[in-house]
Amino acid sequence: MREFYRRHRGLHRWLLAVAALLAVYFALRPVPGLMNWLSRHVIMPWERAVASVCYLFRTSIAEVSYIVLLSVAIFYVANVLRRMVTQPHRGRTLYRFFLTVVCSGLSIYAGFCLLWGVNYYADSFQQQSGIYARSCTVEELEAVTADFAHQLAQAADNVQRDENGCFAVSRQEIFAAATSVYAPSYEEFPCLRMKDHTPKAISCSTALSAMDFTGFYFPFTGEANLNVDCPASFLPSTIVHEMAHQRGIASEQECNFIAIAVSLASGDPVYRYSGLLMGYVHLGNALYRADPARWQAIRDTLPDTVVADLRQNSAYWAAFQGPVNDAASKVYDSFLKSNGESRGVQSYGTVVDMLMAYYG
């Protein structure tokens, strides 16, 4: 047994070290004071410092990292298969392969826990802003949904459109305006104040769509990364969502609320329209589940331009429904639940309660 341990000493020590690190993290994460201190004074300052370097490059360093990691993984698996065929001690080779995969996976998970998971246990945006989610009656939900629909109809005329009436503002223009969108909200939400950089467009955006992602924040580089293949009408509010993660807001439901509230307050007609569109979708979905007839009455008031944007978006995402999409959703759902979002991906719907508290 001792000889067996010595033969794979490096991998065993690696596994024990990562396991110990995760054990410490899980033991200490219920301590809010410590999590707040780590988030505000260690983790987020570190990520912003790393981001300031990564933003010197136009290419997403996060995307490059994923491509390199995938390439290394493919090369490693191919090398292991070659050794299994050409060399003796196949059991030893297989064991090392298994242990390497486990150690690598746990190390990446530990990195996400330390660089991002801590923020799930620090003060939430609700605690920092004083805006707490609340339940509401169907009548209240109907009133706020109708108000969003009315504002959305007015805002629809203030954005460029193509010959089919669909949103046609260039993505370059949307990205260029991103760094000034948060400024008008700083007075009301000082916890959101930070220096912004232009988010990164992902070259392999179709792959993101296949996994049902409109964007992602990468804590290892501090970059906000966006899917630029999907319809652009939701891109501005999605940018604000990912930039909320850069501010240490971990909860998806809170970032959706921030995306809507900041977009509406931005003074930029393109971002305002996108924020209203996102808000209407969340509120409308909740109202439809509660009372389809009330939802239909409001839906019938939308102009053709808004309907065109909603249909274009629905048609785009419907084309990606399948096993890859389902698998990616399950993986992300598990990650959210492991970090305290008990409803997993369903927690996105809770944004309605925050919208009702703020706009109701």
Regions found by a protein language model. Give the residues of each.
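Transmembrane alpha-helices and immediately adjacent membrane-cytoplasm interface residues
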Residues: 73-78, 91-126
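Active-site recognition of the HExxH zinc-binding catalytic motif
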Residues: 58, 235-256, 260-261
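Post-HExxH zinc-binding segment in Zn-dependent metallohydrolases
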Residues: 139-143, 148, 250-295
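Membrane-interface segments at or immediately adjacent to transmembrane helices
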Residues: 117-185
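Pan-zinc metallopeptidase signature
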Residues: 305-360
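Alpha-helical transmembrane segments and their helix-start/interface "positive-inside/aromatic belt" motifs
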Residues: 4-18, 96-101
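Membrane-embedded alpha-helical segments of integral membrane proteins
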Residues: 19-82
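Auxiliary, metal-adjacent structural segments of Zn-dependent hydrolase domains
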Residues: 160-228, 232
